[in-house]
Amino acid sequence: MGNDQADKKKFSWVIKNFSSLQSEKIYSDQFVIDGCRWRLLAFPKGNDTKSDHLSLYLDVAESESLPCGWRRHAQFSFTIVNHIPEKCSQRKETIHWFCEKVSDWGFTNLVPLIELKAEDSGFLVKGELKIVVEIEVLEVIGLLNVSESESMDVNGFHVLPSQAKYVKSLFEIHPDIATKFRIKNQYLKTGYMNVLLCLIETVRRSPKEISKNDLADAYVALESLTDHGFKLDWLKKKLDQVTQKKEKEAAGETRMHEIGEELKDLKLKCSDLEAQLDKEKADVLAAIAPLGSSDDGVFDDFF
């Protein structure tokens, strides 16, 4: 296992004794690409009771140590190496936003297990399976796992190179955002900027992904930032809109539940009424049916 020195965007993982593995899931060693710490997660028997494929995912390592609201956008590919020259390796590629709620992503059905384990497949050599992952980190929100050697100055704020482009665009769109910010300590300035970036990321998320606690924390952060001189009327407006949508969502779900209960009662009543109707129909049919000759000997005296 280890980084491919010829290409720092790649990592190779060799799984030994693949066919005889008993573990449901296994992890690779951690590795660093583009300042982010990763690891691979594999399910040798498939990540599904019905699966007959190798399942493989890219996982953000030590994600619990990253700040609230962290996200990273990455394009990556998995290659299952075939060692027979005339046969093709299996490669799949995808792109994903990794975040607190979804810190791993990949393919549940990567390659059929029967194909991997076939004697002449070329994928297993002495029982070893080689996987190569190639990653291109497109954007990072929140701190990296690995410190970058240099920070960049954007309007007096020291930010990571991966954050610089976004922070520059933020000042271009809102040039007066920090004109009244008076704190001089660079560590504190960087801290407040990171809080602002996390707050913006919270507002950008779908209301369905945001909890009431997230909103409460967001308003506390907003108040702290504005108290220290940030001009964030536009951000408060966005946060209020998210809150309104969240309230509408909650009200709508409550009403849906109420309507569902009412509908259940109505269906039960309809079922009872249908049963009563069927009974009345049967009684009516019985009432209008002609009397037979054997009915209680009523017609015996006439014959």
Swiss-Prot record:
Keyword Zinc among UniProt keywords: no
InterPro entries: MATH-CC_domain_protein, MATH/TRAF_dom, TRAF-like
Xref: Pfam families: MATH_2
Domain of life: Eukaryota
Protein name: MATH domain and coiled-coil domain-containing protein At3g58250
Disulfide bonds: none
PROSITE patterns: MATH (PS50144)
Ranges annotated as spanning the membrane: none
Coiled-coil boundaries: 231-287
UniProt entry tagged with the keyword ATP-binding: no
MATH domain sequence ranges: 8-135
SMART domains referenced in this protein's UniProt entry, alphabetically: MATH
Species whose genome carries this gene: Arabidopsis thaliana
Keyword line: Coiled coil
